[in-house]
Amino acid sequence: MIKQRTLKRIVQATGVGLHTGKKVTLTLRPAPANTGVIYRRTDLNPPVDFPADAKSVRDTMLCTCLVNEHDVRISTVEHLNAALAGLGIDNIVIEVNAPEIPIMDGSAAPFVYLLLDAGIDELNCAKKFVRIKETVRVEDGDKWAEFRPYNGFTLDFTIDFNHPAIDSSSQRYAMNFSADAFMRQISRARTFGFMRDIEYLQSRGLCLGGSFDCAIVVDDYRVLNEDGLRFEDEFVRHKMLDAIGDLFMCGHNIIGAFTAYKSGHALNNKLLQAVLANQEAWEFVTFQDDAELPLAFKAPSTVLA
């Protein structure tokens, strides 16, 4: 059978919090089968757990948060969640000694390296996928996102940014998902923001960790980072990275075709909730062997080495 995945060993890293600008220690721990993805704040006494759940997601101007019933939150979970989706990690406990996951370089790549350093272990329990059975679409003005039935996982994302630094030909990105494709094509794409927004937020004591080290920064005319872009279409690739993380908030890889136009965290989450709320639109599936498994989710040698 296709088995659930966790880590082989505990790994730790430090980084800076986007909101506070302070040092954060991140610890990733293996977890037993059927634990799911659990974020844990160890700076609170007692520690507070936040299971990944579409209904717990709140979108703020700076990041995605998980909020519990007592209005306690953990922030900036989206890029790590994308790395978990990319490598198909089903069970993990993620600890931080702060109210937020460190921003690292603004992409998912540092988290991918950390997960691969921990090693991926298979558990003796069937991995559950969410398979889309009916088309579900959500809209917000001219923005929209939808899932259609498809035996695999494809993503097709279009942005519409009128900015000299973003070429009109680099506003759409489509790909057939796989762990390899995620690592090579998506994981290194960084978040982006306007210099004026960062300066304004910092003047109000917010976004204190925001810098050229953890984002693509633009003014009205150009990219300000000395090293420029990692990809010509890094902006839309990062929006796809965000979507992969947002859609994994159900804790399961999804089998279906995702298409979006000008979508963001809030609309991606609205789509995920709309799918899960309609029992006719999806089902849990497991697979007995690789022959049945959609190509998108076959583990590359780098993951299960």
Swiss-Prot record:
Presence of keyword Lipid metabolism: yes
Cofactor(s) the record lists: Zn(2+)
Pfam families, alphabetized: LpxC (PF03331)
A molecular-function term among this protein's GO annotations: metal ion binding
Enzyme Commission code: 3.5.1.108
Keywords: Hydrolase, Lipid A biosynthesis, Lipid biosynthesis, Lipid metabolism, Metal-binding, Zinc
EC main group: hydrolase
Active site: residue positions: H265
Reaction(s) catalysed (UniProt annotation): a UDP-3-O-[(3R)-3-hydroxyacyl]-N-acetyl-alpha-D-glucosamine + H2O = a UDP-3-O-[(3R)-3-hydroxyacyl]-alpha-D-glucosamine + acetate
Any one biological process term the GO annotation gives: lipid A biosynthetic process
Functional pathway: Glycolipid biosynthesis; lipid IV(A) biosynthesis; lipid IV(A) from (3R)-3-hydroxytetradecanoyl-[acyl-carrier-protein] and UDP-N-acetyl-alpha-D-glucosamine: step 2/6
UniProt-annotated binding residues for Zn(2+): H79, H238, D242
GO cellular component terms, semicolon-separated: membrane
Family affiliation: Belongs to the LpxC family.
Described purpose of this protein according to its UniProt entry: Catalyzes the hydrolysis of UDP-3-O-myristoyl-N-acetylglucosamine to form UDP-3-O-myristoylglucosamine and acetate, the committed step in lipid A biosynthesis.
Name under which the protein is recorded: UDP-3-O-acyl-N-acetylglucosamine deacetylase
Organism: Salmonella arizonae (strain ATCC BAA-731 / CDC346-86 / RSK2980)
